[in-house]
Amino acid sequence: MSSSQNNNSSWIDWFLGIKGNQFLCRVPTDYVQDTFNQMGLEYFSEILDVILKPVIDSSSGLLYGDEKKWYGMIHARYIRSERGLIAMHRKYLRGDFGSCPNISCDRQNTLPVGLSAVWGKSTVKIHCPRCKSNFHPKSDTQLDGAMFGPSFPDIFFSMLPNLTSPLDDPRT
């Protein structure tokens, strides 16, 4: 990123703009700042200062270390909220997460899923709601699966009553 881009970007803008991070949605500042949503996260005051600054400060020594994990864990919480589910729903409908590679699923849109809620266990996978299988995404992403967690697809379909999993559709 050039220094001219740094002047108009926050850490969040920079991080979301990195190739491979397209599965993530933007967590609103008010959600990030709410201390209830920060419970159990380490170093929140120091990291919060870095990720919410209007300018990225590369001299802070923290860039892309703890911030990535911290934002990822806030993201995992946010996508389970009403606003987060709506944001992920838009991405799902656009096909931002890719489609199922299984031919019998007829290019079914997929959702991101983590195989573990524990940071560092595995990278994100894509989950097909039709065949209920998990696959490696075609996109070049190395996001940690904990940014989504293992229950996200189930929560997504249970919390959005107007959506049904294709397996529940009698036409399939």
From Swiss-Prot:
Probably not expressed in wild-type flies. In males lacking the Y chromosome, it is testis-specific and constitutes the main component of star-shaped crystals. Induction: In wild-type flies, it is strongly down-regulated by double-stranded RNA (dsRNA) interference mediated by Su(Ste) transcripts. In males lacking the Y chromosome, the absence of Su(Ste) locus, relieves such down-regulation, explaining why it is strongly expressed. It comes from the Eukaryota. InterPro entries: Casein_kin_II_reg-sub_N (IPR016149), Casein_kinase_II_beta-like (IPR035991), Casein_kinase_II_reg-sub (IPR000704). SMART domains: CK_II_beta. GO terms for molecular function: protein kinase regulator activity. GO terms for cellular component: cytoplasm; nucleus; protein kinase CK2 complex. Pfam families: CK_II_beta. There are multiple copies of the stellate gene in fruit fly, encoding proteins that are extremely similar, which makes their individual characterization difficult. Thus, most experiments probably do not discriminate between the different members. Unknown. In males lacking the Y chromosome, its strong overexpression leads to the appearance of proteinaceous star-shaped crystals in the primary spermatocytes causing meiotic drive, possibly by interfering with normal casein kinase 2 activity. Interacts in vitro with the casein kinase 2 alpha subunit (CkII-alpha). The relevance of such interaction is however unclear in vivo. Belongs to the casein kinase 2 subunit beta family. This is Stellate protein CG33236/CG33240/CG33244/CG33245. It comes from Drosophila melanogaster (Fruit fly). The gene is Ste:CG33236.
